[in-house]
Amino acid sequence: MEALKRKIAEDGIVLSDQVLKVDSFLNHQIDPVLMQQIGREFARRFEKDEITKIVTIESSGIAPAVMAGLELGVPVIFARKRKSLTLTDDLLTASVYSFTKKTESQIAISGNHLSKDDRVLIIDDFLANGQAAEGLLSIVKQAGAAVCGIGIVIEKSFQPGRDELVKKGCRVESLARIQSLEDGKVTFVQEVRS
């Protein structure tokens, strides 16, 4: 997605050869116009999949997931990382390690919101090692629902997340794929267009 790549090139800050800071438009301050374009692009890529629900993880996955849900006309469920007094019944849970925060979280979704009849699109802001996506996959499978695909805003292609998800039979659609963050510079994967 060219608009996203431009925004990353202009406003993204390379903190190391492993970490890209995009808090000025994606995961702290949100650019609503860009987020709307992201939602439309996910909807375009998954429009034929008969998606019934979108599942994401709090908090940075919520904005792109909601915009995609708006475009597809389907509800969005976000997995919570913290216990809630209201999130108690029929919990579907998984353990997730955050590459950026270097912490492990127990994520949960109420089983009341997912059923075996659902066709789910998983959306997240970043794909690095694939831990968040794998946790969400586990939760969706616990509900007996079908995973139609995984939509990623920014993929760090130099990390193993995509390969791990593809090995599990997942379709992964990333809007911007980063080949490298070496020497303080963002280099994108050159996609072959068919």
Swiss-Prot record:
Alphabetized PANTHER family for the sequence: HYPOXANTHINE/GUANINE PHOSPHORIBOSYLTRANSFERASE (PTHR43864), XANTHINE PHOSPHORIBOSYLTRANSFERASE (PTHR43864:SF1)
Keyword Glycosyltransferase belongs to the record: yes
Family: Belongs to the purine/pyrimidine phosphoribosyltransferase family. Xpt subfamily.
Subunit structure: Homodimer.
Domain of life: Bacteria
A Pfam family annotated for this UniProt entry: Pribosyltran
Positions bound to 5-phospho-alpha-D-ribose 1-diphosphate: A128, N129, G130, Q131, A132
UniProt: xanthine binding residues: L20, N27, K156
Lineage of source species: Bacteria, Bacillati, Bacillota, Bacilli, Bacillales
Protein name: Xanthine phosphoribosyltransferase
HAMAP family (UniProt xref): XPRTase
GO aspect biological process, one term: xanthine metabolic process
Catalysed transformations (reactions): XMP + diphosphate = xanthine + 5-phospho-alpha-D-ribose 1-diphosphate
EC number(s) per entry: 2.4.2.22
Pathway(s) per entry: Purine metabolism; XMP biosynthesis via salvage pathway; XMP from xanthine: step 1/1
Annotated function: Converts the preformed base xanthine, a product of nucleic acid breakdown, to xanthosine 5'-monophosphate (XMP), so it can be reused for RNA or DNA synthesis.
Cited InterPro entries: PRibTrfase_dom (IPR000836), PRTase-like (IPR029057), Pur/Pyrimidine_PRTase (IPR050118), Xanthine_PRibTrfase (IPR010079)
Gene this chain is encoded by: xpt
Alphabetically ordered keywords of this record: Cytoplasm, Glycosyltransferase, Purine salvage, Transferase
